């Protein structure tokens, strides 16, 4: 696989120093402002490999350019992001071992995963971590039209206080019957809860990884 084109990072399933066959693979896309090396992406990958799920992280081209130049830049338009995501999915299918494959992402990356999901024949389902239902403070600008007709299974893991879509807001949306939404108690867009809630970011990431693994296993075993 071309590292220069796709800038991938594979987290294999290891036990006692040996690489084991995963039960599934998750291709995970990053959010708008931070790439594959962000703490959330690395922590989630680490948790998921503990559930025997191989994780493929990558940077979109604009993020790869940011890493190389050290200069911040906005994400490319959705069309370009989706083209890259689809090409990466095809490349993984051609060059990696054949296991049930899922896609997902954090925030923007999760949205891109949901938009490519039904068009990607090799993909079983998707997981969105903190889906950006609308821009913060603009609940009228919904990004849900395609979610109303989604055919493949999707799990959305959302902080209850997420400013891109709170629990109260999301529960009122008309979403496809193939979509399941699970909430992290008192979590924000990064799943971080307030101290007085009694929860921690670490336990929420563990919980999100467990929910992801359960979702994947349920659809692998169908």
Predicted segments — roles?
Residues 150-151, 156-158:
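Short beta-strand/loop motif that positions the catalytic acidic residue
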Residues 122-133:
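A conserved short beta-strand
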Residues 100-105, 129:
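Short beta-strand immediately N-terminal to the catalytic nucleophile in serine-hydrolase-like folds
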Residues 112-116, 137:
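Hydrolases whose catalytic domains are alpha/beta-hydrolase-1, hotdog thioesterase
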Residues 171, 175-222:
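C-terminal catalytic histidine-bearing segment of alpha/beta-hydrolase fold enzymes
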Residues 105-109, 113:
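Gly/Ala-rich beta-loop-alpha elbow adjacent to hydrolase catalytic centers
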Residues 2-100, 188-195:
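Serine-hydrolase catalytic machinery in alpha/beta-hydrolase-like enzymes
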Residues 163-168:
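Conserved alpha/beta-hydrolase "acid-adjacent" motif
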């Amino acid at each position: 696989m071309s590292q220069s084109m796709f800038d991938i990072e594979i987290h294999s399933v290891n036990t006692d120093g040996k690489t084991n066959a995963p039960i599934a693979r998750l291709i995970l896309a990053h959010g708008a402002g931070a790439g594959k090396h962000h703490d959330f992406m690395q922590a989630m990958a680490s948790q998921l490999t503990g559930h025997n799920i191989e994780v493929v992280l990558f940077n979109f081209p604009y993020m790869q350019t940011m890493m190389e130049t050290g200069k911040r830049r906005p994400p490319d338009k959705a069309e370009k992001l989706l083209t890259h995501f689809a090409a990466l999915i095809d490349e993984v299918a051609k060059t990696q071992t054949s296991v049930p494959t899922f896609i997902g992402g954090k925030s923007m990356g999760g949205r891109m995963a949901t938009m490519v999901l039904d068009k990607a024949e090799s993909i079983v389902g998707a997981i969105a971590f903190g889906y950006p239902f609308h821009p913060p403070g603009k609940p009228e600008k919904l990004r849900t039209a395609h979610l109303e007709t989604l055919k493949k299974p999707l799990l959305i893991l959302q902080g209850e206080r997420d400013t891109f879509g709170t629990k109260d807001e999301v529960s009122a949306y008309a979403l496809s019957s193939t979509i399941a939404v699970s909430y992290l108690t008192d979590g924000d867009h990064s799943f971080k809860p307030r101290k007085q809630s009694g929860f921690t970011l670490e336990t929420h990431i563990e919980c999100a990884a467990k929910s992801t693994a359960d979702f994947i296993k349920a659809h692998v075993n169908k």
